[in-house]
A protein has these predicted regions:
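Portal/gating segments that form or line small-molecule/metal binding sites
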Residues: 85
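Divalent-metal-activated hydrolytic enzyme cores
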Residues: 22-67, 92-93, 102-120, 137-220
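Bacterial N-terminal signal peptides
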Residues: 9-19
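Bacterial N-terminal signal peptides that target proteins for export
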Residues: 1-10
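Short helix-loop-beta junction
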Residues: 89-97
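Short glycine-enriched loops at secondary-structure junctions
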Residues: 76-81, 101-104, 130
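Conserved functional hotspot residues or short segments at active or partner-binding sites
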Residues: 127
Length: 220
């Protein structure tokens, strides 16, 4: 009987934790969302990630099955070394992630981000660039390719031109400039996002992830 009671209490606690965490993501403002992401990255970089696993994660999956309320949109590179959910130490349902090579934005990508803002009530967009981005490296080196890859490189070229002659590493300079440029374009090219940014309802930030340290830097 005692063992059975312990199991019931344990399951109840797991359900409570998962339900509470799902609710925490809903309706938080941009500044609080950004703080939560940066604190998560600090834990990740220090090897102290704390998001739920096993039973709590399973229960959270059930809780989120019918509705999602992500607290941030992350537009990041497709690079396998930069998974946003791990980098920000978040769990199921916390962030709405859109990934493309070099964070390149087209109509489909923009529509995906607009969906999160318009229909999911998300107030923060993070454009997440990263150290040693292969797409930016190819654009800087003037690489040519086949298929649709040249379209990706073409989209990054403005950042390459913008940073030519600057001191420092040309690839790193272009990576940072590309993220800043994309953040600006997201605001100016979307009739859904622009008025919300102007009113202060939505915030867009550019950020840079270091592969060497695991740390994220906000870009000015």
């Amino acid at each position: 009987m005692k063992t059975k009671t312990v199991r019931i209490l344990t399951c109840s606690w797991v359900a409570f934790v998962a339900s509470s965490m799902a609710g925490e993501s809903a309706g938080i403002g941009a500044d609080e969302a950004l703080s939560r992401l940066l604190n998560g990255d600090k834990r990740f970089a220090a090897g102290k990630s704390e998001e739920p696993h096993d039973a709590a994660l399973i229960e959270r999956r059930h809780t989120l099955a019918k509705e999602q309320k992500p607290f941030a949109v992350i537009l990041s590179c497709s690079d396998s070394r930069v998974p946003p959910e791990l980098v920000f130490d978040v769990s199921l349902g916390d962030i709405f992630v859109v990934r493309t090579a070099g964070e390149v934005v087209d109509e489909v990508v923009l529509g995906s981000i607009e969906y999160a803002i318009e229909h999911l009530g998300t107030h923060l967009i993070v454009v997440l660039a990263h150290q040693r981005c292969g797409a930016v490296s190819a654009a800087v080196s003037g690489a040519t390719d086949t298929g649709d890859i040249p379209d990706v490189l073409k989209a990054i070229l403005p950042a390459v031109e913008e940073t030519k002659g600057q001191a420092g590493d040309p690839i790193d300079n272009a990576v940072r400039a590309n993220a800043r440029d994309i953040a600006k374009r997201l605001q100016s090219s979307s009739s859904i996002i622009a008025p919300r940014v102007q009113s202060g309802e939505v915030k867009i930030v550019a950020a840079y992830y270091s592969l060497d340290t695991g740390q994220i830097e906000l870009l000015k």
